[in-house]
Curated annotation (Swiss-Prot):
It comes from Shewanella sp. (strain W3-18-1). InterPro entries: Ald_DH/histidinol_DH, Ald_DH_C, Ald_DH_CS_CYS, Ald_DH_CS_GLU, Ald_DH_N, Aldehyde_DH_dom, SuccinylGlu_semiald_DH_AstD. HAMAP family: Aldedh_AstD. This is N-succinylglutamate 5-semialdehyde dehydrogenase. It comes from the Bacteria.
Amino acid sequence: MTHYIQGQWHTGNGHDVTSINPANGETIWCGKTATAEQVNAAVEAARAAQFDWFMLGFDARLAIVEAYRSQLEANKAELAETIAQETGKPQWETATEVGAMIGKIALSAAAYHKRTGTEANDTPAGRAVIRHKPHGVVAVFGPYNFPGHLPNGHIVPALLAGNTVIFKPSELTPKVAELMVTLWDKAGLPAGVINLVQGEVDTGKALASHPQIDGLFFTGSSRTGHLLHQQYAGHPGKILALEMGGNNPLIIKGVQDIKAAVHDILQSAYISSGQRCTCARRLYVEQGEQGDALIALLVDAVKQIKVGPWNAQPQPFMGSMISETAAKGMVAAQANLLDLGGKVLVELTHLQAGTGLVSPGLIDVTAIDVLPDEEYFGPLLQLVRYGDFDQAIKLANQTRYGLSAGLLADSREDYDYFLARIRAGIVNWNKQITGASGAAPFGGVGASGNHRASAFYAADYCAYPVASVEADAVSLPATLSPGLSL
């Protein structure tokens, strides 16, 4: 069980790949990658199944998607444990991920009707009707940080709209993808409607470049997303939806309850071991005694964050990063900031060789004139002290990204001022910036995306509008146009 093509499981014909539990280094999955020929077979299966899937009608498609929801409910403990083992995230967090997957079904059905439903109006020229049709065959590229929830957020609305799907998950989380597709199979999805191909860069390239796909929905790094954008620049007939990363700012101004502010900072910067695209990377704190007090409390709180394996009891706040390589990358990022003039307030350390376990870090980078505009994808927060609110907003906007941003402030006027000037697709006030609603769009501007917001707006890129003017019979107008005679 590695690849799922035309309703059947197949072993790969490529090279061996394994999945490692990053918290202990144990191998938990083995398989072989899909070759270009197997990718082609998956696309052909999706193409052959697409029209019949569309012609089933929305209600019949929804019934199968709701059967998938029932499968998620029945298997939520196994799915949460699989996500925890493969990503290193603690069990409490993976349980919430599965809950979000279950909730996505109702949200996607509501979004289908609200964003891409059918509307008819009588006009003097006839009945004007707006309908939406699926693009056809779409590829979904999933990330490792939310290997269930994020691809699910593409797959469910794509299927509801009448598309067929080829799912290519992260090579770091193949076991989660295999279980997800198993549940789709148990839900009764017709053969060819969803297909799974596992692999690394070569598999992804074979799928992304296939001439018979009509669209690609990607969640992942800005670098890969930009390469896909360049590749698709000459293909205006294909829909491309990119959800990429961010170098996200969080500003603190005039907050009396500093303990509550510190809590929101921790949730913004360190949840999921800093491996959420919306995590705060830069923290702006006012100069002065109030800011000093907040930072002192923050330093103490960061030092007390519990880190441990996915199954530790009592449960930790932070689990493992996705790999030892990722952990070493964060140590290197911290060293780079220190070389530029940063000052350690709390040192990020690699806790155990052979694992992705790291402690959270906090670096004062106020003395660095120009911060690297990089998404350090881990639990490393950069602190900047500021003296003027306008200066803080200006610094916050000094990034090519534009995913999430936040303000913790007691003044509504300060928030209105901030909201009008900050450049980001997700802007929160007095809430963690890693908190997003599935009933709202999710996406950013700049290097964070290509104006194809997901979540509630995913329906928008899963279908295209069809405008019609209709009448029940052919009829002559009351008056012919000048120059005509009949």
